């Protein structure tokens, strides 16, 4: 949007798009627009609103959700939810730095119905313990919905 790849241009570009979507930025601090700085601050509600708006936007709606890797299948989430009912059925972008692990994306991956955002800060366990807790949480949240989808797909249509 602004030409040269400078930090302040990334922040301006993200702010411009988010404001066009009418998303409240009161509790948000964007430093670089990429999410790579510890100075960035945002809430799960803000991220969920961005995901929802991107999925509903006529210019990005059909494309944007397909750009995210599928858990248990590819990208940095290829080992997350592997072997569960959500493997391949939830698309998430991961982000991490020391003491921080975040996931944001869509469920189901095909024709998204829900924005999914999970931010963890200052955790005091191993990554494997955190991953196990995150997997139990996500499976618990979406397992009954996934069962409903599976039953519909296996029911003969009249």
Residue ranges and their predicted role:
Residues 1-58, 62:
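A small/polar active-site loop signature that marks catalytic segments
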Residues 2, 37, 94-95, 123-128:
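Short, contiguous acidic/charged loop-to-helix segments that flank catalytic cores in large enzymes
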Residues 26, 38-60, 102-104, 108-121, ...:
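Active-site-proximal alpha-helical segments within enzyme catalytic domains
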Residues 31-33, 67-72, 94, 118-121:
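Active-site-proximal beta-strand/loop segments in catalytic clefts of secreted hydrolases
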Residues 61-75, 136:
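Active/binding-pocket-proximal capping segment
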Residues 79-110:
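Short, Gly/Ser/Thr-enriched beta-strand-loop segments that form substrate-interacting elements
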Residues 133-158:
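Short, gly/Ser/Thr-rich active-site loops of penicillin-recognizing serine hydrolases
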